[in-house]
Amino acid sequence: MSGGKYIDSEGLLYSAPIREQGNIYKPNNKSMADEMNEKQMYDAHTKEIDLVNRDPKHLNDDMVKIDFEDVIAEPEGTHSFDGIWKASFTTFTVTKYWFYRLLSALFGIPMALIWGIYFAILSFLHIWAVVPCIRSYLIEIQCISRIYSICIHTFCDPLFEAIGKIFSNVRIALQKEI
Protein backbone atom coordinates (compact mmCIF):
# COMPACT_ATOMS: atom_id res chain seq x y z
CA MET A 1 0.00 0.00 0.00
CA SER A 2 2.92 2.36 0.64
CA GLY A 3 4.32 4.34 -2.26
CA GLY A 4 1.18 4.17 -4.44
CA LYS A 5 -0.63 7.15 -5.87
CA TYR A 6 -4.32 7.88 -5.41
CA ILE A 7 -6.70 10.13 -7.32
CA ASP A 8 -9.36 11.94 -5.30
CA SER A 9 -12.87 12.96 -6.43
CA GLU A 10 -11.52 16.21 -7.90
CA GLY A 11 -9.00 14.35 -10.01
CA LEU A 12 -5.99 15.50 -7.97
CA LEU A 13 -3.14 13.10 -7.44
CA TYR A 14 -1.77 12.52 -3.94
CA SER A 15 0.49 9.93 -2.39
CA ALA A 16 -0.79 6.99 -0.37
CA PRO A 17 -0.52 6.93 3.41
CA ILE A 18 2.28 5.08 5.14
CA ARG A 19 -0.27 2.79 6.76
CA GLU A 20 -4.05 2.47 6.69
CA GLN A 21 -4.83 4.58 9.76
CA GLY A 22 -2.20 7.19 8.95
CA ASN A 23 0.07 8.95 11.41
CA ILE A 24 0.97 12.46 12.46
CA TYR A 25 3.43 12.90 9.62
CA LYS A 26 1.31 11.54 6.80
CA PRO A 27 -2.47 11.50 7.30
CA ASN A 28 -4.55 8.74 5.75
CA ASN A 29 -6.91 10.94 3.78
CA LYS A 30 -6.89 14.20 1.87
CA SER A 31 -9.21 16.05 4.27
CA MET A 32 -6.85 15.36 7.17
CA ALA A 33 -3.94 16.56 5.05
CA ASP A 34 -5.85 19.73 4.18
CA GLU A 35 -6.64 20.34 7.87
CA MET A 36 -2.97 20.01 8.75
CA ASN A 37 -1.98 22.41 5.97
CA GLU A 38 -4.64 24.97 6.96
CA LYS A 39 -3.06 25.60 10.34
CA GLN A 40 -1.14 28.83 9.93
CA MET A 41 0.80 30.84 12.42
CA TYR A 42 -0.40 34.43 12.70
CA ASP A 43 2.10 37.11 13.58
CA ALA A 44 0.88 39.33 16.42
CA HIS A 45 2.53 42.36 14.81
CA THR A 46 0.67 42.11 11.49
CA LYS A 47 -2.81 41.09 12.63
CA GLU A 48 -5.61 43.56 12.03
CA ILE A 49 -7.26 45.20 15.00
CA ASP A 50 -11.00 45.52 15.44
CA LEU A 51 -11.97 49.18 15.49
CA VAL A 52 -15.57 48.44 16.50
CA ASN A 53 -15.18 45.96 19.38
CA ARG A 54 -12.16 47.38 21.20
CA ASP A 55 -12.57 45.18 24.28
CA PRO A 56 -12.92 41.66 22.81
CA LYS A 57 -11.84 39.98 26.06
CA HIS A 58 -14.21 42.10 28.17
CA LEU A 59 -11.50 43.45 30.48
CA ASN A 60 -13.49 46.53 31.46
CA ASP A 61 -17.01 45.15 31.77
CA ASP A 62 -17.32 45.65 35.52
CA MET A 63 -15.15 48.68 36.19
CA VAL A 64 -15.08 51.39 33.58
CA LYS A 65 -18.62 51.46 32.22
CA ILE A 66 -19.65 54.63 34.01
CA ASP A 67 -22.75 56.36 32.73
CA PHE A 68 -24.62 59.39 34.02
CA GLU A 69 -27.08 57.16 35.90
CA ASP A 70 -24.18 55.41 37.70
CA VAL A 71 -22.85 58.69 39.09
CA ILE A 72 -25.75 61.09 39.52
CA ALA A 73 -29.22 60.09 40.73
CA GLU A 74 -32.08 62.04 42.23
CA PRO A 75 -34.22 60.13 44.73
CA GLU A 76 -38.00 60.16 44.64
CA GLY A 77 -39.35 63.46 45.88
CA THR A 78 -36.15 65.41 45.16
CA HIS A 79 -36.13 66.22 41.46
CA SER A 80 -34.64 69.20 39.68
CA PHE A 81 -36.28 70.82 36.65
CA ASP A 82 -36.50 68.50 33.65
CA GLY A 83 -34.47 70.90 31.50
CA ILE A 84 -31.68 70.99 34.11
CA TRP A 85 -31.68 67.18 34.31
CA LYS A 86 -31.45 66.84 30.51
CA ALA A 87 -28.72 69.51 30.28
CA SER A 88 -26.79 67.84 33.10
CA PHE A 89 -27.03 64.49 31.32
CA THR A 90 -25.84 65.97 28.03
CA THR A 91 -23.04 67.94 29.70
CA PHE A 92 -21.79 64.90 31.63
CA THR A 93 -21.93 62.57 28.63
CA VAL A 94 -20.31 64.96 26.13
CA THR A 95 -17.64 66.10 28.61
CA LYS A 96 -16.73 62.52 29.50
CA TYR A 97 -16.62 61.52 25.83
CA TRP A 98 -14.47 64.41 24.58
CA PHE A 99 -12.22 64.66 27.62
CA TYR A 100 -11.48 60.93 27.31
CA ARG A 101 -10.62 61.47 23.66
CA LEU A 102 -8.39 64.43 24.54
CA LEU A 103 -6.57 62.46 27.24
CA SER A 104 -6.22 59.51 24.86
CA ALA A 105 -4.77 61.77 22.17
CA LEU A 106 -2.30 63.37 24.57
CA PHE A 107 -1.28 60.41 26.72
CA GLY A 108 -2.42 57.28 24.85
CA ILE A 109 0.74 56.72 22.82
CA PRO A 110 3.18 57.59 25.65
CA MET A 111 1.26 55.33 28.05
CA ALA A 112 1.21 52.54 25.44
CA LEU A 113 4.97 52.97 25.11
CA ILE A 114 5.47 52.84 28.88
CA TRP A 115 3.21 49.78 29.31
CA GLY A 116 4.83 48.07 26.33
CA ILE A 117 8.28 48.58 27.87
CA TYR A 118 7.00 47.44 31.29
CA PHE A 119 5.44 44.22 29.96
CA ALA A 120 8.49 43.55 27.78
CA ILE A 121 10.71 43.82 30.87
CA LEU A 122 8.27 41.68 32.86
CA SER A 123 8.20 39.01 30.14
CA PHE A 124 11.98 39.12 29.81
CA LEU A 125 12.48 38.69 33.55
CA HIS A 126 9.93 35.90 33.75
CA ILE A 127 11.46 33.99 30.82
CA TRP A 128 15.13 34.57 31.60
CA ALA A 129 15.19 34.89 35.41
CA VAL A 130 12.11 33.66 37.27
CA VAL A 131 11.47 30.35 35.51
CA PRO A 132 15.16 29.31 35.48
CA CYS A 133 15.44 30.17 39.19
CA ILE A 134 12.37 28.11 40.02
CA ARG A 135 13.62 25.18 37.93
CA SER A 136 17.03 25.41 39.58
CA TYR A 137 15.43 25.53 43.02
CA LEU A 138 13.29 22.46 42.26
CA ILE A 139 16.34 20.52 41.07
CA GLU A 140 18.40 21.51 44.10
CA ILE A 141 15.61 20.87 46.60
CA GLN A 142 15.23 17.25 45.42
CA CYS A 143 18.38 16.28 47.32
CA ILE A 144 17.07 17.85 50.51
CA SER A 145 13.63 16.32 50.01
CA ARG A 146 15.13 12.84 49.74
CA ILE A 147 17.10 13.31 52.96
CA TYR A 148 13.98 14.71 54.66
CA SER A 149 11.92 11.75 53.41
CA ILE A 150 14.50 9.27 54.76
CA CYS A 151 14.46 11.00 58.16
CA ILE A 152 10.67 10.95 58.31
CA HIS A 153 10.52 7.27 57.37
CA THR A 154 13.29 6.39 59.82
CA PHE A 155 12.19 8.32 62.91
CA CYS A 156 8.61 9.53 62.63
CA ASP A 157 6.92 6.59 60.89
CA PRO A 158 7.84 4.03 63.60
CA LEU A 159 6.88 6.46 66.36
CA PHE A 160 3.47 7.27 64.91
CA GLU A 161 2.87 3.63 64.01
CA ALA A 162 3.55 2.64 67.64
CA ILE A 163 1.27 5.38 68.95
CA GLY A 164 -1.40 4.24 66.49
CA LYS A 165 -1.15 0.65 67.72
CA ILE A 166 -1.38 1.82 71.34
CA PHE A 167 -4.56 3.79 70.71
CA SER A 168 -6.09 1.24 68.31
CA ASN A 169 -7.37 -0.81 71.25
CA VAL A 170 -9.03 2.12 73.00
CA ARG A 171 -12.81 1.71 72.95
CA ILE A 172 -15.24 4.43 73.93
CA ALA A 173 -18.82 3.64 74.84
CA LEU A 174 -21.28 6.49 75.11
CA GLN A 175 -24.58 6.08 76.90
CA LYS A 176 -27.35 8.56 77.25
CA GLU A 177 -28.97 8.67 80.64
CA ILE A 178 -32.42 10.03 80.89
Swiss-Prot record:
Q: What is this protein called?
A: Caveolin-1
| GO cellular component term, pick one | Golgi membrane
* Main function: May act as a scaffolding protein within caveolar membranes. Forms a stable heterooligomeric complex with CAV2 that targets to lipid rafts and drives caveolae formation. Mediates the recruitment of CAVIN proteins (CAVIN1/2/3/4) to the caveolae. Interacts directly with G-protein alpha subunits and can functionally regulate their activity. Involved in the costimulatory signal essential for T-cell receptor (TCR)-mediated T-cell activation. Its binding to DPP4 induces T-cell proliferation and NF-kappa-B activation in a T-cell receptor/CD3-dependent manner.
Its source organism is Didelphis virginiana
Q: Which residues carry this modification: N-acetylserine?
A: S2
Where is this chain primarily localised?
Golgi
The ranges of region (Required for homooligomerization) come to 2-94
Segments on the Cytoplasmic side according to the record's topology features: 2-104, 126-178
The UniProt entry lists membrane topology as: Peripheral membrane protein
